[in-house]
Amino acid sequence: MRLRFAIALLVAAALLGCAVPRPEGPVAVKILAINDFHGNLLPPRGGIRIRDPQDAARTLTVAAGGAEYLASAVAELRAKNPNHIFVAAGDLVGASPLVSALFHDEPTVEALGLMGLEASAVGNHEFDHGSTELLRLQRGGCHPSDGCKGPQPFAGATFRWLAASTVDARSGRTLLPPYYVKRFQGIPVAFIGLTLKDTPHIVVPSGVAGLEFRDEVQTVNALVPDLRHQGIEAIVVLIHEGGQPSGDYDECPGISGPIVHIVEQFDPAVDVVISGHTHRAYVCRIAGRLVTSADKYGTLVSEIDLVLDPVSGDVRQASAHNLIVSNDRFAKDAAQTRLIAQYERLAEPLAKRVVGRVAAPLSRDESPAGETAVGQLVADAQLAATTDDGAQLALMNPGGLRASLAGDAGGVVRYEDLFAVQPFYNNLVTITLTGAQLQRALEQQWLDQPRPRVLQVSRGFGYSWDAARPPGQRVVPGSLRLHGAAIDPQQPLRVTVNAFLAAGGDNFTVFAREGREPRTGLMDIDALERYMAARGTVAPGALDRIRRID
């Protein structure tokens, strides 16, 4: 596999050096793009919410996504133009539903290969299990611990992961190729792949050990002269970083977030930016460039149309729109159905195991204070699992909660439902913090202003925060309480978090630097399963543990 890949790169380089006749007229190119697929081989529960075309004040839920429907949508769009390419902006794997995660996301890699994906940026979730595992997914081979669990030996990705800004700290070389070049009627187009530079702060340290994540702008701008020296003028960036728009899925009013500043600083030679990470949908013009994002889980495909100049080889025109991968409009792709069915049969004994019931769905929608019903459940489960280690309260990062918990129509909850909520296999860790240290940790919830991360808290613990105060001063002094009693700043507390938070993930550095006497416990999903089994039926409670003051 490595030899074939190396030969392919050499051949591509040789072809770039050949004199290929330029076309007589402009060349139309169609780029199809997705992002943040996260192993959603089956349509995600909840589909996608869009503005009601009949009433702008309302929204509609459209059943969308899933590999079977995505493959059909891509095939239909691809048929419109023989000059096409299918690409992605990262997080194709990681935080995946059970049918993919149980097999280390090999099913997703195979499914995307069947769709004809050609290149993708590496996202932060591609590092959930470390760079060695990412390279295995690229090159193929059995998992080092679990072996080959799938219906056939795993051959690796047929598409190319790109990592221009991810560098081996020892060698200084990129972990994976920095870009991919494809010719359309003789005109080369470069696709540069970027991982967000904040990846070390949102992935467990073991996942990024030995790697450097360099500045996105500096990386791209340094590559531009080399690409242009090769005769490449059309440049597309695939970046796993994004923004927060305020409009509908095909609009871009008032976009904010890191992508804006990044795109504004790119070399003018960059023509199109395909983004992701924020799980939002938009089609924008930023600093004169086309910028797209296609929501998440394969619910949308960005359809990007370029017109290449036959003389300069540069992009003359660029336009785009986001297409909903509607489960009503598109038929299931037969090859995807067969692939998924193979893995579903293997996963069924575990996936369909009944673990409990819900009296009503527990949503991950946030209250004004930042609480969620499913977050409360998980925090309570983690506290219950660690009381024997002296735990007095538990805190859960919202990014580790990937879905609401609804069960089936009768409220029956199966293991696959729990896994959809907590797919990371994090151990629980109980540490000692003083009241003052706990307050400092809570202040770190607002360090990342565009994306505050309000920790979910267990029953019996609560506090107030003031939205009018600046970050670092938002927790109301004296408001921290445990079972109704005020927490003294010097009071030692046993606090349970998951291993990701214990290592300082999401910039919660207090847990890593100041937590004492760590004790490792169950896996998070095991704690949740035990909690559900012990209670039989759970119901959403009042979202009143955290109080927001405006």
Language-model segments: residues:
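Short conserved micro-motifs at the rims of enzyme active sites and ligand-binding pockets
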Residues: 203, 303-304, 330-332, 406-408, ...
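Positively charged n-region of N-terminal signal peptides that target proteins for export
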Residues: 1-4
